[in-house]
Amino acid sequence: MNDMAHLIPALPESIFRAYDIRGVVGDTLHAETAYWIGRAVGAQSLAQGEPNVVVGRDGRLSGPMLVARLIQGLADAGCQVSDVGLVPTPALYFAANVLAGKSGVMLTGSHNPPNYNGFKIVIAGDTLANEQIQALLTRLQTNDLSRGEGKVEKVDILPRYHQQIVGDIKLAKRLKVVVDCGNGAAGINAPQLIEALNCEVIPLFCDVDGNFPNHHPDPGKPENLVDLIAKVKETGADLGLAFDGDGDRVGVVTNTGSIVYPDRLLMLFA
């Protein structure tokens, strides 16, 4: 405990959801919200013996402002922060697994509209959900926080991430693939990574733009795959892939333009 209880704002309980912390920027989510979430995550990570925390963000316009305060909160909690910058969520989880600690926070609005942002959190190797997320709110409400002087370092994790994937995957033949990143975070690495797997890549909306000007970044909805289907047919591609805003959801289209829905993808992966 410390003597700062009167400084901690009352955060909206509605943003502490089942699988993440998420809100509308400027309404239920502000820069100071990010700071205090950093303080709570830092305290919890330290309590579980993990002083090292990795932080990344997606390409949303509110990202730089929020991530700066998140990192400051973690450092003020006494954590050592590895800032991996703009990355897709899978790269953040990879970094949390291979760098010094097993904790990480991804600042992302995922597949939600542009004015949303949020926090996906892993502490000591466990992705937080349900009561674990509520425990962070309880820490803030009871002022159960740590205080320290942590340090921040910038880490370029993508080369190591690419090396791991390319080393693990060998394709039986060269494929022509249309890659629709939906102007999300996957645009910084998905085309290059898939190309490194010996594919011919046709990029579509791969410039990171937090306004998502071409279509909503949710490949789970058929209306967001219209451009991908058209490009696959136009180019005679073998396959089409579409990613959501932070690159942890994928939509798949066959060479004929048919959508492979998630239940069938699950059977293929099994």
Task: Give each language-model segment a name.
Residues 1-70, 76-77, 154-175:
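An N-terminal, well-structured beta->alpha segment
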Residues 2-23, 124-143, 242-244:
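Short, compositionally biased "basic patch" segments
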Residues 26-33, 58, 62, 66, ...:
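Catalytic cores of large soluble enzymes that bind and process phosphate-bearing ligands
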Residues 33, 37, 66, 88, ...:
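Catalytic-loop motifs flanking and including active-site residues across diverse enzymes
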Residues 36-40, 91, 161-164, 224-227, ...:
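Well-ordered alpha-helical segments embedded in enzymatic catalytic cores
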Residues 47, 52-116, 163, 193-253:
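N-terminal small/polar loop signature for handling phosphorylated ligands or for N-terminal nucleophile
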Residues 105, 118-133, 248-270:
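Glycine-rich phosphate-binding loop of actin/hexokinase-like ATP-binding domains
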Residues 117-235:
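Gly/Ser/Thr-enriched, mixed-charge loops and adjacent short helices
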